[in-house]
Amino acid sequence: MSHQLLLSIRDAMVIYKEKPVFENLDLNIHQGLRTALIGKNGAGKSTIMKIIYGIKSLDEGEQWVEPGISIGYLGQEINYQENQKVFDFIFENISGDERELFKYKVDIIADSLQLNISLNMNMLSGGQIRRAGLARALVEEPDILLLDEPTNHLDLNAISWLENYLNGYRGSLVCISHDKRFLENISNQIFWIDRGNLRVCSKGFKFFDEWSSMLLDQEARELAKRKQILAQEVEWASRGVKARVKRNIRRLNQVKEMRDKLKKDESSFRHTTKKINIEPIKDLSLIHI
């Protein structure tokens, strides 16, 4: 079944402290898919959400959004006006003409999240402010809903209610969460940010371990094959380079480049998995030219 494309990012690069968080990243959001956005801390998950929402720009790349598409966002930081009522905060992005239509939803969602909508926002605890931010994002019913750690400060009953709500949501969802069970229960797609690249799985988070192990096993085999080829090149260089210095110095330099690239990729692979122990490569500095 095909799903309408709502948003697309192409060849994206974002730089932080003079280093790329990711580069050449492609991302598509389609109608009706509920995506678990995962990756190690610092991989750029929240950055991607801010880019999608439009509060952060790409350093390089292009972004396209289907005209008329609405995007809602629960971020890590919740901003509100002093002495603003919870009710008014939730309705902040909804026009006056639509408020009457959405009022019943405010009551249902606020009650499910244990919010008193008659209180002022500055009277709420940090956890209550997070729940108010979540309520606002849900009430807006955007075409693309972005949730960054929505289960923080929710009890089990509220989490169960949120799972049911999101599974019936008609728009598209992109969610970051450390709650693995929650992601398993709500998602039908995975975006995995891995070493600056975005890997996509068309199944939900419950299949992540199986899917990621398959990808990493394949990568391990490719690294082993490259290591074998490099070993053959090193053996050739050790035996023949002294007799053919001028004719083969370029090839020896290529071997060193292969060595450096493989070491870099092995280090990156170990950092990602810490599962596979790859033996160190023979040091080409022992070959004298």
Predicted feature residues:
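ABC ATP-binding cassette signature C-motif
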Residues: 1-223, 278-287
